Each structure stands twice: as C-alpha cells, then as structure tokens.
C-alpha cells in the first residue's frame, strides 16, 4: 500500500531563480563591497592598473616612450597611433572589451543597488558605490585617451543595445 502526500499551497520561489537585479537589490554592505572589489578584479585581469596595459596607455599620452628593440613591437602601434590599427588588432580589442566590462559591471551596481533606510548604513553604501562611480569614470578616462570620443553609457540597458 502506497501513501503519497503533496503540498498544494506551497508558493515558495526557488532560490536558483533569483535574477541578477534581485540579487544586487538584496545585497548587504559586505556583499556590495565584494562586488565592488570585483570591479578592481576586472582591471587586474587585463593588467591595467599594475602592469603592461598602463604602459600602453601612457605611451598614447606621451607620458612615456618605448624603445623599438624588436620588430612588430605592440608599443610602436600605440606610440604612432597608426591608421592601420583596427578592432581586429587583438591588443586594442582586448583593451576596449575589458574597460567596457568594468563600465557595464559598475553600471549594474550603481543602478540596481538599493540604499537601506538607516542613514548611517546608507552613507556606507554610498561610499562603496562611489568606488564604482570612480572605476567607471577611470575606465572612460583611459578609453577616451586611446580612442577619442565615445558614447557615454550609464545604464545596463544602453550597454546591451549600444555597446560600441
């Protein structure tokens, strides 16, 4: 003899179906700080603030110069800003994509984080979000130095439809 039971009135939403928007809106301060740290990680993955990418960007701005010690030196392309450089150039493409990754991820945090009602805690949230604003601005600063005029994308929706 088999007995079965069921719970007809169960309306609990499965946690695996939480959207990115809901997740960001539910973040506590520690989670928001960790997400902002992820923006720094996006920069590190491209070696921007710490290694070769910063050198490339500074060559464009004439802050440093390169030594043409070998043929096909990537820095020569940055120094000369030659017209034959296209999006097919892997180095330029990587630079473009990684900075826009930082911009898009910063936009998600800035636009979807929900400030708590407690004024002290809200101030701490704003400080963390200030870092996201800064990193988005820094990314645009470097991109403008390299590529000139760019569209200003401030929302995730704009990034989905207008990614340059």
Predicted features and spans:
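Acidic, glycine-rich segments characteristic of secretory precursors and extracytoplasmic regions
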Residues: 7-59
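Short, well-structured active-site flanking segments
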Residues: 12, 144-155
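Short linear capping/connector segments at secondary-structure termini
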Residues: 17-21, 154-161
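Short clusters of hydrophobic/aromatic residues that line enzyme substrate/ligand-binding pockets
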Residues: 23-24, 59, 81, 85, ...
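Conserved, well-structured interaction surfaces
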Residues: 33, 41, 73-147, 161-163
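Secretory-pathway/luminal and periplasmic proteins that interact with or process carbohydrate-rich
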Residues: 44-50, 66-67, 139-149
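Acidic helix-start/capping segments at beta-turn-to-alpha-helix junctions
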Residues: 56-63, 128
């Amino acid at each position: 003899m088999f007995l079965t039971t069921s719970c007809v009135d169960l309306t609990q939403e499965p946690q695996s179906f939480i959207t990115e928007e809901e997740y960001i809106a539910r973040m506590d301060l520690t989670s928001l700080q960790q997400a902002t740290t992820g923006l720094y990680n996006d920069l590190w993955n491209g070696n921007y603030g710490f290694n070769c990418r910063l050198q490339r960007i500074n060559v464009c701005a004439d802050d440093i110069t390169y030594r043409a010690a070998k043929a096909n030196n990537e820095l020569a392309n940055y120094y000369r800003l030659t017209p034959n450089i296209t999006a097919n150039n892997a180095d330029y493409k990587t630079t473009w994509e990684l900075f826009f990754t930082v911009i898009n991820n910063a936009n998600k945090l800035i636009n979807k984080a929900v400030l708590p009602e407690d004024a002290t805690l809200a101030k701490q949230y704003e400080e963390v979000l200030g870092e996201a604003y800064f990193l988005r601005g820094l990314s645009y600063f470097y991109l403008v130095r390299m590529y000139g005029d760019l569209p200003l994308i401030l929302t995730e929706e704009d990034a989905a439809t207008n990614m340059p």
